[in-house]
């Protein structure tokens, strides 16, 4: 896409929001409580602040303020306000390609924020536990928050990911014409690295005329030992392993498709 010569500041708002899910099976009530305590500590407010601060570093944002809070009995929230410094728009890379992991890239934001909220969850029956992290990166200006996508998914262990990207508002060029998007995008997947795409089954639901893009991701490989908390699969009977595998897989598909699935 040809670079636009704008009249004044770029007023487009670009928002990237996604849910990241981690699934676990805890055989007993003690294991369930242990998993919730473990995941709550692993992703406490301090750890999340480190992750979001590194996100700011990746996209070159200047941190204005950090608000963070751990909650009882569980959960945490962090919000970071960021700003930009003057930058030559000619230096901005707006092409469709994956962003970096922890490497630094120049990017500048204004009236923007990055926030995360966590939601550990379990049910007393069935042994299934889930951890959900809601993340939003919202920027105002020429930079797309999609550049932070790779890093954030790699930092948070993810069995299932749902991603939404939307461009809102408009900006004007020097001739007064409105522009409702200032970069090319066909799919959120184009901003992911090849190694990440190889790990997940993915599907897109995009509304191009509204500048709304949606991608869902489900981890391809299933290894039961990665989903057990303090219990080894070899300590279970074959029937137990099959039942737990079926329950976990059903849980993951229900979250992925966003609907309850009847037992076969």
Curated annotation (Swiss-Prot):
Its cofactor is pyruvate. Heterooctamer of four alpha and four beta chains arranged as a tetramer of alpha/beta heterodimers. This is S-adenosylmethionine decarboxylase proenzyme. Binds 1 pyruvoyl group covalently per subunit. It comes from Salmonella typhi. Belongs to the prokaryotic AdoMetDC family. Type 2 subfamily. Pathway: Amine and polyamine biosynthesis; S-adenosylmethioninamine biosynthesis; S-adenosylmethioninamine from S-adenosyl-L-methionine: step 1/1. GO terms for molecular function: adenosylmethionine decarboxylase activity.
